[in-house]
């Protein structure tokens, strides 16, 4: 739930009001390998919440979880969190739709 991220940001800012905040490893696993519209919606919703919080708090960075599909300690290779698909047999990388969305968002919002 995106509002949970806002709640966490507000909680941390109460304990460290003068410290810059960085959101790290925010993302979700998606069942679809390349076409991951659910992940794009997840990022849109969560970034909207981060933008609202940044109006009043010193949020300095946001990092997606993760660039590449990888080995997760608790889940092994079963869940894919990356915005780049990795074929574990061949190591071939393929940009997912979420990668392309991030790319267009960064270009669109660059100063």
At which residue positions do the language-model features occur?
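Non-catalytic scaffold segments within catalytic domains of secreted glycoside hydrolases
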Residues: 1-111
């Amino acid at each position: 739930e995106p509002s949970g991220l806002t709640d966490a940001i507000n909680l941390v800012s109460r304990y460290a009001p003068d410290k810059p905040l960085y959101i790290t490893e925010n993302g979700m696993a998606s069942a679809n390998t390349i076409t991951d519209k659910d992940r794009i919606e997840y990022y849109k919703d969560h970034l909207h919440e981060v933008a609202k919080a940044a109006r009043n708090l010193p949020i300095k960075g946001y990092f997606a979880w993760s660039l590449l599909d990888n080995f997760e300690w608790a889940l092994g290779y079963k869940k894919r969190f990356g915005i780049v698909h990795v074929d574990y047999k061949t190591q071939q990388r393929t940009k997912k739709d979420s990668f392309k969305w991030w790319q267009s968002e960064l270009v669109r919002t660059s100063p």
